[in-house]
Amino acid sequence: MALKRIHKELNDLARDPPAQCSAGPVGDDMFHWQATIMGPNDSPYQGGVFFLTIHFPTDYPFKPPKVAFTTRIYHPNINSNGSICLDILRSQWSPALTISKVLLSICSLLCDPNPDDPLVPEIARIYKTDRDKYNRISREWTQKYAM
């Protein structure tokens, strides 16, 4: 079941790739993918190329995939291990969701962080109290780690 669904999503991604994103299997392991997200133009991550790993559980799509950044990023909802605080990867997961929709949701999280549900409270505080500083540090990290 999982493998069939993963193959279908791979074909759908090839046919209709989401804007600024790509994803596919690492070698022959269909349960382990690598994804790339281009930093959105209307964000301090503009120009960066961010790599992520995707691990599908054996009971996918009934359980969410594990998605994490491997490229370092300064963001209130993404920690230094690359873990992402995004409701659809946890409690709001639905089998109707696809990797394409997950990647687009992560893209919109880069444009619009959620400082009220932070994984890194200190970055959330800076985002809320000093947006210029947040944007500056985000741009610096993007240049340092994602270019």
From Swiss-Prot:
SUPFAM superfamilies: UBC-like. GO terms for biological process: protein K11-linked ubiquitination; protein K48-linked ubiquitination; ubiquitin-dependent protein catabolic process. Its EC number is 2.3.2.23, 2.3.2.24. Pathway: Protein modification; protein ubiquitination. Keywords: ATP-binding, Nucleotide-binding, Transferase, Ubl conjugation pathway. Disulfide bonds: none annotated. InterPro entries: UBQ-conjugat_E2_core, UBQ-conjugating_AS, UBQ-conjugating_enzyme/RWD. One of its GO terms (cellular component) is nucleus. Residues 1-147 form the UBC core domain. It catalyses: S-ubiquitinyl-[E1 ubiquitin-activating enzyme]-L-cysteine + [E2 ubiquitin-conjugating enzyme]-L-cysteine = [E1 ubiquitin-activating enzyme]-L-cysteine + S-ubiquitinyl-[E2 ubiquitin-conjugating enzyme]-L-cysteine; S-ubiquitinyl-[E1 ubiquitin-activating enzyme]-L-cysteine + [acceptor protein]-L-lysine = [E1 ubiquitin-activating enzyme]-L-cysteine + N(6)-monoubiquitinyl-[acceptor protein]-L-lysine. The keyword Cell inner membrane does not apply. It is an enzyme of class 2 (transferase). It holds the Pfam family UQ_con. It comes from the Eukaryota. The active site is at 85 (glycyl thioester intermediate). Interacts with SCF (SKP1-CUL1-F-box protein) E3 ubiquitin ligase complex. Interacts with CNOT4 (via RING domain). Interacts with E3 ubiquitin-protein ligases CBLC, PJA1 and PJA2. Interacts with PDZRN3. Interacts with PPP1R11. Interacts with E3 ubiquitin-protein ligase PHF7; the interaction inhibits cleavage of PHF7 and promotes association of the complex with the nucleosome core particle. Accepts ubiquitin from the E1 complex and catalyzes its covalent attachment to other proteins. In vitro catalyzes 'Lys-48'-linked polyubiquitination. Mediates the selective degradation of short-lived and abnormal proteins. Functions in the E6/E6-AP-induced ubiquitination of p53/TP53. Mediates ubiquitination of PEX5 and SQSTM1 and autoubiquitination of STUB1 and TRAF6. This is Ubiquitin-conjugating enzyme E2 D2.
